[in-house]
Amino acid sequence: MAEINGLLEVAKMKISASIKCNTIRGFIGWHSCDNICLDMQDVLDMCEDAFKQERYQESFEADTYVLVSCVKLASYADDSSGMLTDVIIRALKLIDLSTQTISKLDAAMREHALSLIMKEAKKKEFDGWDSWRYELLEKAICLCDEKSAAKLEKLLDTFLEDIENDDISEYQRQEDTVLRYKLHRHIKGADAVKDELYANLDIREMRRIAVKDATNARNYNEAEKLCLEQIKKDDGRFYTNTPEDWNNILFDVYMQSGIADKQIEQAKKILLLGNEEFWDVLKRLYQSQGTWESQKPILLKELKQSKHSECYQSVLVKENEKKLLLESVTEDSYYLFYYAQFLVKDYPNETYELCANYIREQCEQATERRLYKRVCKNLLQLIKWKGNATAKLLVDEFKATYPRRSALLDELQKVEKKL
């Protein structure tokens, strides 16, 4: 029987007390949920310390308790801040660290850890949170031998039966397929389950695994083919700046292949999709070929034509292309008050005029004090840029044009004090 000061018992008492203290009239609001999450992070800190002291089983059991407590809390607490999700992610990482370590220890510890994960994954707390259930079960794969793998698959069968009649079950089915594949791969080896992998390339994670395998084997043509197939399938509907995007994955394949021309081609494509980070990538690639100065104006022109004005304007600031930046914010003034700070020193009159036109339109559309405050905030910014004369002109103009907007006149008085 565990002592009262055992890590798991401490975790139970601390989390229980925190939930009780932060439950108000049966409800756990935003700030209360954050308070509980901070206490859970403290428990995970203790788990990390225990792990460093080689108290692996204690750390693992407490990590798992924190995870299940979080999942239960997610069903009724207000996690608007996202702190609860952060705790879950950290708990899963620590569980993974523990299972990877325990997998190298004696059979009894492996069996205990596997049994605990399977027991916890069955709990109703995970109903409706299948992604976390499958993530937890994935941490158990490294603990399995052929016999225990069969037990894990039997458990997966029961989960699959539960969702057979569920209309919103495709995601769960994919999770099941991926988890089974990883289990089979762990037991049999990658080569033995290659057909299983390629039979499920419609699942994005399976395709990513196939790309990684091909790249590791230096089969860059295969990795390229796998990426291009998915990019074509997406048909331009998806692009994010995350490493998991297929255009970014393809660029990584080209980087590992060492083929400079393809690196440049793909980096340019990603830049023109609006990812400004690839401006520096292209710059380095062109500089290595000694062609940067000739390619730069061509690239700027293409970026301008791509219609990703925010990306284009950000690059112009980076390259100190102030004249082109002035032209760009004249055409598209959405981010004027951010980029004006880079222009006002060299082009004061032009900047003041652009700001004045922007503020006039802003004031014309404003209908309440909250919006009038934004107008006056921009007027005050104009004053900071030494555009006092323009600001005074606008204040006088607004007072004459909108004499019945008492809230506006009230806010304008605050601006006049700064003139």
Regions found by a protein language model. Name each.
Residues 1-419:
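Eukaryote-biased, non-catalytic alpha-solenoid scaffold regions
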